Amino acid sequence: MSVEQKLYLITRNLQEILGEEELKRIVSERELNVYWGTAITGKPHIAYLVPLMKIKDFVDAGCNVKILFADIHGFLDNLKAPIEKVQHRCAYYEKLIKSALKMLCVDLDRIQFVKGSEFQKSERYTMDLYRILSITSKHDAKKAGAEVVRQVENPMVSSLVYPSMQALDEVHLSVDAQFGGVDQRKIFTYARKYLPLLNYEKRIHLMSPMLPGLNSDKMSSSDDLSKIDLMDSKEAIWRKIRKCFCEEGNKDNGLMMIFSHIVFPILQLKGECVRITDRDGREMAFEKYQEFEEEFVRKSIHPGDLKSNAARLIDEIIRPIREEMEKDLDMVREAYN
């Protein structure tokens, strides 16, 4: 694979890159080392498929990929994951994300899976944490986590430590680049400012767009009606989609974004087109999202038909993940009661 082809796979569908020239230099010389981290908090939802599809691109481009299950981060973020539940939820996340990657035809042998607690309690990491905290102001720590850490009027000190640890993870995972959603941007710029003060090099930061919620700006694990969980039943999917805003001819809604960022890319990956059936039984087939969007804007697709087909297609996509997870319901109950 040529350098140009690798760069195309690594950068396609990203919203922003910090350190693009360094990225080009590394890819022209050797394999890129990149990681994606996920804090162990609420149940993963379908928006997780966006970064997981990007991870497939990294693997296909020959990158050395690490996935971090940030168990300590989940506990630090205003107790989103109670300490007694963290390890159970970590097992849940690992099984679920591996199931989703298999659905996306990703070779799991090409990915290294790491728990934060495996290295974040080491003497070297702890001393680095003391060092970075000693030069970080409360203002910078709070600003860095503003889009990621739960914001409360009187935050716990633990939530202010969160961005510093995420910055240090780049060093202690020995990576060239960190990948995340554009909501991570303030943490990324914090890392780029503070790591050089500890005599560590700036890392590259790759950011994907955020998928909006069904009725909100962001799909969130803490807002049940904004999201579709990767384990939701067919009935639960329909119940949530039926309630979401969808005006005839108006493409600015959460459902259309799901078609754009999840349904079309995944079906294209599987070599399938998107088939929409209306209430009269007539079928339309679409190879590209743009064609689909144009038909919706022309009002050729009714919102009711959009919702019913979205529910069907989403169920078809996540069904293999759900079925794999249902083989170990005891693990699910231990993680989320």
Curated annotation (Swiss-Prot):
One GO process term, biological-process aspect: tyrosyl-tRNA aminoacylation
Keywords: Aminoacyl-tRNA synthetase, ATP-binding, Cytoplasm, Ligase, Nucleotide-binding, Protein biosynthesis
Complex formation: Homodimer.
Entry-linked Pfam families: tRNA-synt_1b
Reaction catalyzed: tRNA(Tyr) + L-tyrosine + ATP = L-tyrosyl-tRNA(Tyr) + AMP + diphosphate + H(+)
Species per Swiss-Prot/TrEMBL record: Encephalitozoon cuniculi (strain GB-M1)
Any one Gene Ontology molecular-function term assigned to this protein's record: tyrosine-tRNA ligase activity
Enzyme class: ligase
Catalytic activity, EC: 6.1.1.1
InterPro entries, alphabetized: aa-tRNA-synth_Ic (IPR002305), Rossmann-like_a/b/a_fold (IPR014729), Tyr-tRNA-ligase (IPR002307), Tyr-tRNA-ligase_arc/euk-type (IPR023617), Tyr-tRNA_synthase (IPR050489)
Residue span of motif 'HIGH' region: 40-48
Primary location recorded for the protein, binned into one broad class: cytoplasm
Protein family membership: Belongs to the class-I aminoacyl-tRNA synthetase family.
Cellular component GO terms held in the UniProt record: cytoplasm
Protein name as it appears in the record: Probable tyrosine--tRNA ligase, cytoplasmic
Protein's UniProt keywords contain Secreted: no
Sequence motif 'KMSKS' region, residues: 218-222
Annotated positions binding L-tyrosine: Y35, Y162, Q166, D169, Q184
Subcellular locations according to the entry: Cytoplasm
SUPFAM superfamilies named among the record's database cross-references: Nucleotidylyl transferase
